[in-house]
Amino acid sequence: SVILKPASLTPASAIALTEIIAKQDLPTGLFNLIIGSGSGIGKLIATSPEIPAITFTGSVEVGKSLYADASPHLKKMQMEMGSKNPLLVLDDADLPTAINCAANGAYGGTGQKCTASSRIIVQEGIYKKFVEGLTDHISKIKVGHALEEGSQMGPASNQSQFESNLNYIEIGKREAKLAYGGNPMNMRTPGF
């Protein structure tokens, strides 16, 4: 059987998945959803003799803690932590495709997914055109409430994530040339 424990601040998609699975002709208890604090529930899962394996996606800090709790019990573990996914754009790349992939990879899901493109490595021969095209593309992204019609990018999931985003922007300003934005937006809707 499977126990799904989503991030405590963003359980909606896990609830929707559970509702879909519940409508299937599956044995009771095959799929289980637990919502709550990761520190409490994670430790219970990690130390339970009834749970032989864990798959974890999240931060390095939380992953280390989970591993420390689970390893004495010789559990099988699969961990994907602190992703920093690069996107490589070569000189012979199809420019519109590369720009679209970069924008979707970096900004899709407000960049809050483990598969987000955290860095883009661009060869010198295509660099200028790529930056110009990407800047134009992202300037057209409609930022708004996540459920607002036409909104393409919603808010950060919490204040801590928002502050982390701002910190990365400041690092970028110090270590590179800013091409677009760089300041928090003044939005009329709640969120971060």
Segment roles from a protein language model:
Residues L33-P52:
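A structured beta-alpha segment of the ubiquitous adenosine-cofactor-binding alpha/beta core
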Residues A12, G40, K129:
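Residues that form or flank phosphate/diphosphate-binding pockets in enzymes
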